[in-house]
């Protein structure tokens, strides 16, 4: 098992500036160089992460290869191996390439149902192979913690860092009270860059809203957000 670098995984790409900000600020705080597992390396290079991560490792796409997809589907069904898909996707950071510490980029990943299986599988896979995992900078809906598979997943992490008090309190109330920490989103530690204010700006009378592209993408009425 390798101990020279720390792996960051479950990164949704730098086009999602929330993820980019967490990785950017986290890389500046870590005591060792970070390897970033990503499915959008060119996007990450375009934004702020190129000089901060020691290298990018591209996640393997199992869906693009019919033979590979069929083989791993049969392996999962016949051998009852729920994590074999993740072992293929993450082959460059698991198995013989395993690192001791792996940090899951939290953000609001646990707020999306289509992410949950991968989050659980990756955490379980790393632990089965003897590595440690940290869920960093996360927000989790309290209702989600009523699901047994999510509770099992939370208990598997070696440490959890919640980025706001609602998640921290919900974890404690659910019985996850060991090695959990409350710390503001590390994006607040990013270097400040002053920009010219728009015409009509009135100090103390303005309200700024940071609109996620995901909100726009999921509009039920096109254009209603903006």
Regions found by a protein language model. Name each.
Residues 1-226:
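Active-site anion-handling motifs in enzyme catalytic cores
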């Amino acid at each position: 098992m390798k101990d020279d670098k720390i792996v960051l995984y479950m990164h949704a790409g730098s086009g999602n500036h929330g993820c980019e900000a967490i990785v950017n600020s986290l890389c500046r705080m870590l005591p060792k160089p970070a390897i970033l597992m990503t499915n959008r390396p060119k996007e990450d290079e375009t934004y702020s992460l190129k000089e901060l991560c020691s290298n990018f490792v591209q996640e393997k796409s199992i869906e693009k290869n019919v033979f590979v997809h069929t083989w791993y589907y049969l392996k999962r069904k016949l051998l009852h191996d729920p994590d074999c898909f993740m072992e293929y996707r993450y082959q460059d950071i698991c198995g013989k390439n395993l690192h001791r510490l792996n940090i899951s980029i939290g953000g609001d990943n646990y707020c999306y149902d289509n992410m949950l299986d991968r989050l659980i599988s990756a955490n379980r896979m790393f632990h089965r192979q003897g590595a440690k995992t940290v869920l960093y900078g996360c927000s989790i809906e309290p209702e989600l913690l009523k699901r047994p598979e999510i509770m099992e997943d939370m208990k598997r992490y070696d440490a959890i860092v919640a980025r706001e008090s609602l998640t921290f309190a919900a974890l404690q109330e659910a019985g996850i009270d060991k090695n959990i920490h409350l710390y503001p989103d590390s994006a607040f530690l990013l270097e400040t860059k002053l920009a010219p204010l728009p015409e009509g700006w009135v100090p103390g009378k303005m309200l700024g809203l940071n609109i996620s592209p995901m909100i726009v993408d999921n509009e039920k009425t096109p254009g209603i957000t903006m």
